[in-house]
UniProtKB/Swiss-Prot annotation:
GO terms for molecular function: flavin adenine dinucleotide binding; monooxygenase activity. C-terminal Cys can react with bacillithiol (BSH) to form mixed disulfides. S-bacillithiolation protects Cys residues against overoxidation by acting as a redox switch in response to oxidative stress. This is Bacilliredoxin reductase Bdr. The modification S-bacillithiol cysteine disulfide is found at C220. Changing C14A: Retains NADPH-dependent oxidase activity under aerobic conditions, but at a lower level. No effect on S-bacillithiolation. Decreased bacilliredoxin reductase activity. Decreased NADPH-dependent oxidase activity under aerobic conditions. Its cofactor is FAD. Keywords: Flavoprotein, Oxidoreductase, Redox-active center. S-bacillithiolation is the formation of mixed disulfide bonds between protein thiols and the general thiol reductant bacillithiol (BSH) under oxidative stress. BSH is an equivalent of glutathione (GSH) in Firmicutes. This protein is a NADPH-dependent bacilliredoxin reductase, which debacillithiolates (removes BSH) the S-bacillithiolated BrxB (BrxB-SSB), and to a lesser extent BrxC (BrxC-SSB). Involved in a redox cascade increasing the efficacy of BrxB function by reducing BrxB-SSB and thus reactivating it. Its EC number is 1.8.1.-. InterPro entries: Bdr (IPR023856), FAD/NAD-bd_sf (IPR036188), Ferredoxin-NADP_redctase_2 (IPR050097). The lineage of its organism: Bacteria, Bacillati, Bacillota, Bacilli, Bacillales. It holds the Pfam family Pyr_redox_3.
Length: 324
């Protein structure tokens, strides 16, 4: 069993930021990541532009300089790799945490796909991007249905449905149209979401107006088959459209089960873990959370730009305990 002073589960920007803050108080935390560093950003659409400006994505006082105000995915990947190198953050990549158990003497045993560790402090920064919100409709498990969008090229000359009406849906629809797909967007809301990036909405609306994109508001998907999608538009009758592929961009949620198994209490309504906002410590002493996982089901509440500060609260609390 390997002893560590602190273990961070999750190597996204907020987990890496926590590692840097812990280094500043003399704790060289180990980051355990099931993919590689900033795995969620790697899984973003290939041509993704960030909502935040580059300086709001900075961690560890390492400057993130880009020619445009808002960086793109590949620039962010390069930046966070550089931070890991420059700050000598220890990252065990491609290692999956299987189980976290609290022992009688207030330490934790962390079992992974490769090793077993023991530590007094466990920081969970696992994000939410691995767990899509399923619609629960027949056919959602067909191989032609995706909950992540990478790029448009494979869908050239195909009939594609995008489900959802927020940024990820609009981004996917625009990329698909550029690649020559025939796109229908089904959104259960009655108007465009106010959260859509203001610089892409005009382009999207223009494509809807000229008929390039078919936009259906008040649309509820009833079922998906090999060659069709059936939906209900408002109170009207069922509508069936020809379909080759579906992108269900219906959002994501944190892994509640993982937290609950450790003993962290979750608010059933909001999906938010119980934690002290000043220290980021949960109801389980020694277990802290960092990043979007603290927001529960409302992923629009915490981003990299505010989640990156959680590590400072955690480090301050741990420093207090270590100095007693």
């Amino acid at each position: 069993m390997i002893q560590e002073k602190a273990i961070i589960i999750g190597g996204g920007p907020c987990g890496l930021s926590a590692a840097i803050h812990l280094k500043q108080i003399g704790i060289d935390a180990l980051v355990i990541e099931k993919g590689n560093v900033v795995n969620s950003i790697y899984n973003y659409p290939t041509h993704q532009t960030f909502f935040s400006s580059s300086e709001k994505l900075e961690i560890g006082d390492v400057a993130f300089i880009t020619e445009n105000r808002k960086p793109v995915r590949i620039q962010a990947l390069s930046y966070y790799r550089e931070v890991v190198k420059r700050k000598n953050i220890r990252v065990n990549a491609f290692e999956m945490v299987r189980k976290v158990t609290k022992t009688q003497n207030n330490t934790f045993v962390i079992e992974t796909s490769k090793e077993t560790y023991t530590t007094p402090y466990c920081i969970i920064a696992t994000g939410y991007y691995d767990h899509p919100n399923y619609m629960g409709v027949p056919g959602e498990d067909l191989p032609k249905v995706f909950h992540y969008f990478k790029e448009g090229h494979p869908y050239f000359d195909k009939d594609v449905v995008v489900i959802g009406g927020k940024n990820s849906s609009v981004d996917a629809a625009l990329e698909l149209v550029k690649s020559g797909a025939r796109v229908t967007v089904l959104y259960r809301g009655n108007e465009y979401s106010p959260s859509i990036k203001p610089w892409i909405l005009p382009e999207f609306e223009a494509l809807v107006r000229n008929g390039t994109i078919r936009m259906e508001f008040g649309a509820c998907v009833e079922k998906i088959t090999e060659n069709e999608v059936v939906f209900r538009s408002g109170e009207k009758e069922l509508i069936t459209i020809k379909n080759d592929f579906v992108f269900a961009m219906t959002g994501y949620h944190p892994d509640h089960q993982f937290l609950e198994k450790i003993g962290v209490e979750i608010d059933k309504e909001t999906g938010r873990p119980f934690f002290n906002e000043e220290t980021m410590e949960t109801n389980v002493e020694g277990v802290f959370i960092a990043g979007v996982i603290a927001a529960g089901n409302n992923a629009n509440e915490i981003f990299i730009e505010n989640g990156r500060f959680h590590g400072g609260h955690i480090a301050a609390e741990i420093a207090k305990r270590e100095n007693h």
